[in-house]
């Protein structure tokens, strides 16, 4: 019977659906294993061959674990909200829900063709109310919680309200936006609105004034990674920094727990290091500086308290509220012009750009350690969100301060004995402190650091700051709170209405608050977000439902929030929802959560290291605090798949002609290289007729060939439509079959490395599957499988494979597994092995990689159940023992020939046989060897 992959794959994909092969339920008799891919955003372009790489890798592992007896959860869904669908809606007027559904249908069709073991009964779509019900629920929980620093967990906000009524906020140690101080009497005297403003200072989900990347053309706030060189990634529209009142999540409260949790999970060290740097823990001191000739004072944070005597200027972030307070009238015009320029740069660009810019505020600060008045400057190398948004500048010992001082001619005062700061700053934290205070100046305070090591000086200064009420010792984190508002339509609506300008949550039993219909997807004429177009977007607090906006009376009917949630909202807890996707009473049933706990294997790209992978860890820790998740860490092991790059092809057109010259002849002409569609090229040979039909301008093309062929050039580039190197997996499946695609993607190289897509090798993988098939069927359709005992050689070949593939799968070394399969099938073919006991175990071992053909052959072997329900074969070391060993025979250390010996041959017997071999006589030359060294199972060296 011929290997007809089209019929086989269609048959088994249908059978898997009918028999619910991949549906899974909790089973206490089995150990669980949860496999998860980062779910895709369904774009209009569909999948190209790079997208399934991680899905195939995780699917192989999921199938393998099932064969090992685990109860495997392997779900799939769609991250369906997002800006691309909304932009398409703006351009075409078509509702995002329509395009999103069409895109999802296309993705599902493509995914089904590849033969994944997804449990589609658990499919989720973040844009469906049944799903975002629980995103809204989690947001409400965050709004109604604060973070207790003493207990290191989220607690109900009602506890704060009760405490404020008795104690005020005396002794409170909670994460907050700013330090407040009030008594119980003062709390009780405040209006409801004033109390709500105070509570907003502590809530985990809160409204706050933040600097954002604002894109007027898109009418929305953009995340840093959505802005490139001052313009939006999508559309290339100008982006400026703007202060807006936005919903935020107090992610910073969880900074230390996010750091500590990294020690408990199996992620790569490089990715852990990326997160550690992003969280950015630093120990230091906050020190207060008074403004000269003013009652104002401000606080800076420093990790180098030892450098207080070297402060020669101060720098404020352009966004700091202090800028307006400290800018003198004489400097106002210059400062305003500078602020306008900095608005056009994102924080990420400011961090990356080392060029020096700044402006003097006109004010001075008093150094509390020297009494000196130092100028206060404004510069965009200082960021408002880190520390206090103000720094003390010590140019002798900080490279950015040094560059600034050199540029503006400010004093540079070294504080370490023997350091040379004539060309660059001395940033090392080693050496002996000097000039602290300077010997030629009368000391302003009774602190001296001279003669101490830097480490000693840091600790002594921190203690001095604490004892003299100049500030406090503090641990600081670079991690910012997450901005959680977007001025878009296609996102989760906030379950929030506004009363007297303050936000209130709609009742929990009224969730989900569904996204309303609008007829326009751009901001309103008055600048409101697109939800401002909704005609029924007011909340009736009596009837608990949405009503027409015209009914708003601000007594019982109030306006609803017009912003929507950002893209990461729906992806921050989706792994929990997969466990119990149809539960309308809870995010996940506690018993179900207790069984699945967290994701055992998570597969996705490294580009999410400081976005999704931070937010989801934070979100899960919060849910753990409120009892909605049994474990703190959502993803136990993380594997980052590499990128499959495009392999572009080129044709070479002779200048000013319609003639194209083949690759190895092009140097004889003046040519222009042009990208050509890789789908009309095979093994770098161009299909000439297909090329002529590809584009009208090539219809009359002529060719200069070599050996009767047109050979194309090639290069590795990003896979993109503009380079005509996008390969659709459907085309590969149609031509070679899904099993070939699956195995070939793994064969390209290690899962975690990036590699180019190259169809030149795919024929070899397809031939391998046909050769595997030929162990079962002859070319004349004869069924070859026999129930006969296997030979020693056949068992050795099989068990060598089982051992290799078992180890490879555990290590995600799938490329070497594919090579091992090829070697084994070649060996069995040469041995003319058609033994059932060999082929049965071979089918099971190959099944995770090529499930369709293995299901078919498993069925022909007489099994009534799926190969998925078989047991993974164990290798037997007895079969792997070598009967003979090939020894290298050397004379005076130089290899001359090889000899075979029994594996258990004694050293004396080996020596005698070597000396007796006629080939040895040439090298011994009649002499008596001084000694013979036998390295067991490797080499024999005769010393003459």
Curated annotation (Swiss-Prot):
Protein EC: 6.1.1.4
Annotated catalysed reactions: tRNA(Leu) + L-leucine + ATP = L-leucyl-tRNA(Leu) + AMP + diphosphate
Motif ('KMSKS' region): 718-722
HAMAP family: Leu_tRNA_synth_B (MF_00049_B)
Residues that coordinate or bind ATP: 721
Subcellular location: Cytoplasm
Entry's family note: Belongs to the class-I aminoacyl-tRNA synthetase family.
First-tier enzyme category under EC: ligase
Gene3D superfamilies per record: HUPs, Isoleucyl-tRNA Synthetase, Domain 1
GO biological process: leucyl-tRNA aminoacylation
Entry keyword annotation includes Ligase: yes
Motif 'HIGH' region mapped to chain: 40-51
Organism taxonomic ancestry: Bacteria, Pseudomonadati, Bacteroidota, Bacteroidia, Bacteroidales
Species of the source: Bacteroides thetaiotaomicron (strain ATCC 29148 / DSM 2079 / JCM 5827 / CCUG 10774 / NCTC 10582 / VPI-5482 / E50)
UniProt protein name: Leucine--tRNA ligase
Annotated keywords: Aminoacyl-tRNA synthetase, ATP-binding, Cytoplasm, Ligase, Nucleotide-binding, Protein biosynthesis
Domain of life: Bacteria
Pfam families per the UniProt record, alphabetical: Anticodon_1, tRNA-synt_1_2, tRNA-synt_1g
Keyword tRNA processing applies: no
Record-level Gene Ontology MF annotations: aminoacyl-tRNA deacylase activity; ATP binding; leucine-tRNA ligase activity
